[in-house]
């Protein structure tokens, strides 16, 4: 999508420090971290909501989810980690491009609201 910041990051049209990249997605550090280690896994294909996903998109998301544990050392996930996907304004989705928050590096409680 032409005006999507995350599409620009993923496609190399806007400068960002990529921690990891493959054919499916990139990983960057969150600019407003909510944990000691806070990364974003951003699919290169644009879609905003899980409900918009095709079967192909579902396979893409599965590949991303299978890759994240393999990045354990790079992302410092050793003590455990949390994955979050916000869907919609009320959930805190601030960028209209589906992405996965990867949080680690500290003991986390459960305070979703």
Which positions does each model-derived feature cover?
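HIT superfamily nucleotide-processing domains
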Residues: 1-113
């Amino acid at each position: 999508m032409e005006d999507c910041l995350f599409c620009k990051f993923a496609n190399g049209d806007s400068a960002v420090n990529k921690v990891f990249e493959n054919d499916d997605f990139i990983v960057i550090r969150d600019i407003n971290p909510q944990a000691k280690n806070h990364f974003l896994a951003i699919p290169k294909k644009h879609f905003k909501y899980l409900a918009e996903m095709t079967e192909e998109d579902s396979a893409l998301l599965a590949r991303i989810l299978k890759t994240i544990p393999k990045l354990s050392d790079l992302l410092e996930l050793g003590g455990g980690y949390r994955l979050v996907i916000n869907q919609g304004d009320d959930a805190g989705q601030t960028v209209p491009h589906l992405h996965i928050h990867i949080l680690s590096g500290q003991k986390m409680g459960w305070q979703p609201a």
